Regions:
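H-loop/switch region of ABC-family ATPase nucleotide-binding domains
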Residues: 177
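C-terminal regions of RecA-like/P-loop NTPase motor modules
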Residues: 183-289
Length: 289
């Protein structure tokens, strides 16, 4: 399963990777794991010298050394070098996340040049955790989903598979996207439509006319509903669920607005309240405007 995720990782890293290179890469993955004593046998994952613990997993630097050994894989090694020895070498480390923590923050805000790789890596970790225990309720939120959905077919299929199967793991998936053109760009919109078809509830905010027409077609909206979408104010939306459409207005409580606002004036006002009232500042005021 990990090797499948690695293949997706490399299609994002090397968009023009060839079928031959993918085959050579697959062989390199297997060799890299074998060097750590790990084979297709799940038992090989366990460290015999430390019962109950896994063996040390290979990192990108280990794969890099294997790729350097053959002329035909040298191009991939050269591209990978930036993630091993260059400016993005933070990818070249063992995972050090304590998954027993109540809260985990996977901060990728400083990885703008490798945002696609970082987003996929974080999502792959979260999806793996979500599948560990079917008895626990969970939800995965994928913001700006178009960025992965429009990358390539392997990545798009990975996203679609989450939406198709997460209910079987006791969970739910939510995606948010502002760029609908890219959301439906791959293979004639095959994957974007697939996500929509596996999503029970859709919430549509204000859209430009061109994008509203796309939504009208995909959700079979009326002309009046499409026109309303183009005229929505902040807080207005159309909810589509179970073949029923409803125009709504969302009103945040003061606390909700304080926690999510990015408006400069709101943040300044919140800062002043915090300085005056401390943590009780969040309790001041009623419904947000």
């Amino acid at each position: 399963m990990k090797i499948q995720s690695l293949h997706i990782f490399f299609t994002i890293l090397i968009p023009d990777i060839t079928h031959e290179e993918r085959q050579l890469l697959d062989e390199a993955f297997i060799i890299t794991y074998q060097k750590k004593g790990i084979t297709h046998d799940n038992v090989s994952l366990w460290d015999q010298d430390h019962p109950g613990k896994y063996k040390e997993m290979p990192i990108l630097g280990d794969l890099y050394q294997v790729l350097l050994e053959k002329e035909e894989t040298r191009r991939m090694a050269n591209i990978l070098n930036r993630l091993v020895n260059g400016s993005s070498s933070n990818f070249n480390h063992q995972t050090n996340i304590d998954s027993d923590n109540k809260y985990m923050i996977l901060d990728i805000s400083e990885m703008q040049s490798d945002l696609g790789l970082a987003t996929f890596t974080a999502l792959d970790f979260v999806w793996s955790k979500a599948k560990e225990d079917r008895t626990k309720e969970k939800a995965i939120f994928i913001d700006e989903c178009w960025a992965l959905l429009s990358t390539n077919e392997l990545t798009a299929n990975y996203i679609l598979e989450i939406f198709k199967t997460i209910r079987g793991y006791g969970g739910a998936a939510v995606c948010a996207s502002q760029d609908l053109e890219d959301f439906f760009s791959l293979k004639g919109g095959k994957y974007g439509k697939g996500v929509l078809n596996n999503t029970k509830t859709k919430i549509i905010l204000n859209l430009e006319h061109k994008e509203a027409e796309v939504v009208k077609k995909e959700l079979d909206l009326s002309e009046a509903e499409m026109l309303a979408i183009t005229r929505f104010e902040r807080g207005n939306a159309l909810i589509s669920t179970n073949n029923n459409n409803l125009l709504v207005e969302f009103k945040a409580s003061r606390l909700e607005k304080d926690l999510i606002t990015t408006d400069r004036k709101d943040l300044k006002e919140l800062k002043e309240r915090l300085e005056k009232y401390g943590e009780t500042a969040y309790e001041k005021g009623g419904m947000a405007k």
